[in-house]
């Protein structure tokens, strides 16, 4: 059960921190873990309680907590959340709440293709000259797909289209 709690701890510790290794958690992510896992219920355990417990268990000049400090914080919050239970039962209850949880990303926008957007972005449905702008895989050809390119090489600077002289005279 503790290993599952440690995995959840690591997932929340790394959430939103690109440079984080996931071994230490800051106050913001600790509050998020408590809220998302249901440890903070808003009545017996509030966000203020979570912040106070975080400040108690972290080192004096540190900004983050390790998993060992996290276990102490969870015990303290659990005593408040589950009154009348033994410390071991409290820890098991908290770990049960945390089991298999991931950081929730509510309010994050997701790309959707609806109606016209789907039709306009699918290059296989293009017609006319527009369909020549893309290869079979749907990747754009660039300027080669938009314009007819003449080869501007020849013996004289004004002569355009090398190799076309023989075709004209015959």
From Swiss-Prot:
Keywords: Cell projection, Cilium, Cytoplasm, Differentiation, Flagellum, Spermatogenesis. Residues 127-147 are annotated as: Disordered. One of its GO terms (molecular function) is tubulin binding. InterPro entries: EF-hand-dom_pair, TPP/p25. The keyword Isomerase does not apply. SUPFAM superfamilies: EF-hand. It comes from the Eukaryota. It is found in: Cytoplasm, Cytosol; Cell projection, Cilium, Flagellum. GO terms for biological process: cell differentiation; microtubule bundle formation; microtubule polymerization; positive regulation of protein polymerization; regulation of flagellated sperm motility; spermatogenesis. GO terms for cellular component: cytosol; microtubule; sperm flagellum. Residues 129-139 have a biased composition (Basic and acidic residues). Probable regulator of microtubule dynamics required for sperm motility. In contrast to other members of the family, has no microtubule bundling activity. Belongs to the TPPP family. This is Tubulin polymerization-promoting protein family member 2. It comes from Macaca fascicularis (Crab-eating macaque). The gene is TPPP2.
